[in-house]
Structure formats: structure tokens, C-alpha cells
From Swiss-Prot:
Keywords: Cytoplasm, Methyltransferase, S-adenosyl-L-methionine, Transferase, tRNA processing. It is found in: Cytoplasm. GO terms for biological process: methylation; tRNA processing. Gene3D superfamilies: Vaccinia Virus protein VP39 (3.40.50.150). The lineage of its organism: Bacteria, Pseudomonadati, Pseudomonadota, Gammaproteobacteria, Alteromonadales. It comes from Shewanella putrefaciens (strain CN-32 / ATCC BAA-453). The keyword DNA-binding does not apply. Specifically methylates the adenine in position 37 of tRNA(1)(Val) (anticodon cmo5UAC). This is tRNA1(Val) (adenine(37)-N6)-methyltransferase. The keyword rRNA processing does not apply.
Length: 238
């Protein structure tokens, strides 16, 4: 399925997951100010890397394991206005994070990670890879972020709220710490079902993490003012 934003176009037909609201919210929210080198882990169609390119002057590295998704990602990058600043690496983040040239290299890391920790795999193999943590566990993801993030760098993620307890347990065993948490409610009056996470490699932080909420739609189904403000540079009809 093709998806057109204000400044770029995505063809995600061959990718594991279609363009999602999760990805758009994460890509619009991640604080990229002053970032010079950005890493998009599990790039899929390339949407996060392209959003980062629109919002910054950084050089962006997209890493994608699946061959079919990587082909689509490269196509989308090539058709964008920022092809000269975005580089695709096909392979695993586990391998890339062990490469000496990438250790401590990135100012910002962005990732919409696999979120099904247990349960049956999706029937379509690419979709299964994109949705299940079998290919990239939270533990492996945090280890890769630790390896690749520069001193005082930042990492932005989006997770299902039900995964937060396990994620926090693993986070406590890493060198990463919370900077900010945003609980996302899909509709006003509903419970939060996603969480935006901002992490850093800074140690012994004395400032408490910032905690807030974001509601995507009001009770009539229309985008909230906060959602419009966040995504209006991307969605065509906003």
C-alpha cells in the first residue's frame, strides 16, 4: 500500500508492516535537535528515517534485516528529497552494533521495535519478523543502543504499554536511563495503550524523568489538537 506525506512518498507493499500511526507519532515526536548522526533500527519502509531527514539536517543510517523490506526502503529513500543524507545497511542491528566504526557513533537512535513477545507468529513471514521480538528481543535492542549511542546521546522508542514492565526490568540492568515517558491514549477517555520512551546513556541523572500523556483522537473520532500539532508537517489533510 502506498502512502503520501507532505514531502515524501512511501511504498510499503513489500514490507512487514504497513505505515502505522505508531511510526508517524514516534517520527514526529523524537527530539532530534542538534543530532548529526541518526540510526533507524529496523527501518522497514524507511518511514522513520525519512521523517528524521525532513526534521533535521543529520546524516541517517537505516538498518533493515529483511531483503524484501530493504529493497522497498532503498526505493523510498531514492525517491525522497534527502537521498544524499540517508544510507541503508542491510543486516542485523546485532552485527552492526559490534562494528567498531559504529560504537558510540550516533547522537540519536530511533526504533519502532517488534512488539509481540509471545504467541503465534503472523502467517506472512515479513510481517512476522516485523511484529515479533524473536528476531530482536528487548534485551538485544537495549544492548545495541548502548553500543551505538554516543555519550549523552538519546534514543526514542514506542512500545505497547503491556510490555513496559518487562522493558523497565531490562532497562534497569543496562546503562540507559529514562529522560521522558509519554503515555498514548488512542481515544479520549480510554486507557493508554502505547508509550513513547526517551532514553539516554547519561549516568547518575539527578533530574526526574518527564512524564506526560498524549491523546490521539477525541470522543468524536477527530484528531486531538495535540495530535494535529504533532503531525501537521506530515499528514496531507492537516
Amino acid at each position: 500500500m502506498a502512502f503520501t506525506f507532505k514531502q515524501f512518498h512511501i511504498d510499503d507493499l513489500n514490507c512487514g508492516m504497513a505505515v502505522s500511526t505508531d511510526a508517524v507519532v514516534l517520527g514526529a515526536w523524537a527530539p532530534l535537535t542538534n543530532a548529526k548522526q541518526i540510526l533507524d533500527i529496523g527501518a522497514g519502509s524507511g518511514i522513520l528515517g525519512l521523517m528524521a531527514a525532513q526534521r533535521s539536517q543529520a546524516n541517517i543510517t537505516c538498518i533493515e534485516l529483511d531483503n524484501t523490506a530493504a529493497i522497498a526502503c532503498q526505493h523510498n529513500i531514492a525517491q525522497s528529497p534527502w537521498a544524499s543524507r540517508i544510507r541503508l545497511v542491510q543486516g542485523s542491528i546485532q552485527q552492526l552494533s559490534q562494528a567498531e566504526e559504529y560504537q558510540g557513533y550516533f547522537d540519536h537512535i530511533i526504533c519502532n521495535p517488534p512488539y509481540f513477545e509471545h504467541g503465534p507468529q503472523a502467517q506472512l513471514s515479513q510481517r512476522a519478523m516485523a511484529r515479533h521480538t524473536d528476531q530482536l528481543s528487548f534485551n538485544e535492542l537495549l544492548a545495541a543502543i548502548e553500543q551505538c549511542l554516543s555519550p549523552n546521546g538519546l534514543a526514542s522508542l514506542i512500545l505497547p504499554i503491556q510490555s513496559l514492565h518487562n522493558f523497565n526490568h531490562l532497562l534497569s540492568q543496562s546503562r540507559l536511563e529514562w529522560v521522558e515517558r509519554v503515555d498514548i491514549k488512542s481515544v479520549e477517555g480510554k486507557r493508554a495503550n502505547r508509550v513513547l520512551c526517551l532514553l539516554t546513556t547519561q549516568t547518575h541523572r539527578t533530574v526526574e524523568p518527564k512524564v506526560s500523556e498524549l491523546t490521539l483522537r477525541d470522543t468524536s473520532g477527530q484528531y486531538s489538537q495535540a495530535m494535529v500539532h504533532l503531525t501537521q508537517d506530515f499528514y496531507l489533510k492537516l
